[in-house]
């Protein structure tokens, strides 16, 4: 093949989705188990009837619905094919070659990918000892080449959530020309007092990213959104790939916004299960940081590969993060029970380095 391919692509870490195989209990991808919210199926069916037509590239109806729901102006909202595409677009609109993007590590796996694809340089700031954002270190990492900071709150994969006071102090210390993206993919599962929309209102350099993939149950349809200053929204529109937010996605998202009561009931159920699972794991001898998302994190270090492999052999798929830890999605109660039963076995505890009886 004679085509010229960017040489640096060889060093880009490919995004690795959660695995799946027939018959397995899949607790690897932070998906909801209950499907779309009420009204979504009918909205999708109506949209499919016009699948021969291009979607509204401006997503006017969706943006107006989001603006009303969030109590912002339509000029403050952009739609995307999941919030990850908006992450990519933020790098594109803020960074020239060699500019820097700061984020905690470990955090969302897509950050290093979108940064390098955008010809920018990743500045990874290690998490604190309790697996949260080290905001002071992130501030200290800012240079004259810093253009963008990602703050995943709650953090994926560790689950920690920052408070309103912590974020206010951090945001007010960031130079006004540096864009801060508050990635709130798991916002609906958090009961922290931090709300990115409220933090954005008085800070034009703050962008809030949210998605319909998690709590709203639309992971397979792909739709997310950004809330930001109109100048940023206009710039996002200039790099947006046309028609990537399908008519089906737009219709499903609009219908989802009308089911707030059901969404709250579902997220409360997940939170109750999250608490139950974390408590049981701690009682079994595991270290489990407090989580504000729909998953729990086990910081097993170098034992992570062995534990993940043992879990797979038991028919339960979880997410391994190198030699740092593993993440377990909160599923249905019977799925969670299966994982807890595995985690309490001698095989699992030996893999995790937890003492077991002879």
Swiss-Prot record:
Pfam families, A to Z: Aminotran_1_2
EC number: 2.6.1.57
Enzyme type, top EC level: transferase
Protein name: Aromatic amino acid aminotransferase
GO BP, sorted A to Z: L-histidine biosynthetic process
Record keywords: Aminotransferase, Pyridoxal phosphate, Transferase
Family, as annotated: Belongs to the class-II pyridoxal-phosphate-dependent aminotransferase family.
Record-listed N6-(pyridoxal phosphate)lysine modification sites: 214
Catalytic activity: an aromatic L-alpha-amino acid + 2-oxoglutarate = an aromatic oxo-acid + L-glutamate
Keyword Transferase (UniProt): yes
Domain of life: Bacteria
Subunit architecture: Homodimer.
Family annotation (InterPro entries): Aminotrans_II_pyridoxalP_BS, Aminotransferase_I/II_large, ArAT, HisP_aminotrans, HistidinolP_aminotransfase, PyrdxlP-dep_Trfase, PyrdxlP-dep_Trfase_major, PyrdxlP-dep_Trfase_small
Cofactor: pyridoxal 5'-phosphate
Record PROSITE patterns: AA_TRANSFER_CLASS_2
A GO MF term: aromatic-amino-acid transaminase activity
Taxonomy of the source species: Bacteria, Bacillati, Actinomycetota, Actinomycetes, Mycobacteriales
Keyword Zinc-finger (UniProt): no
Organism: Rhodococcus erythropolis (strain PR4 / NBRC 100887)
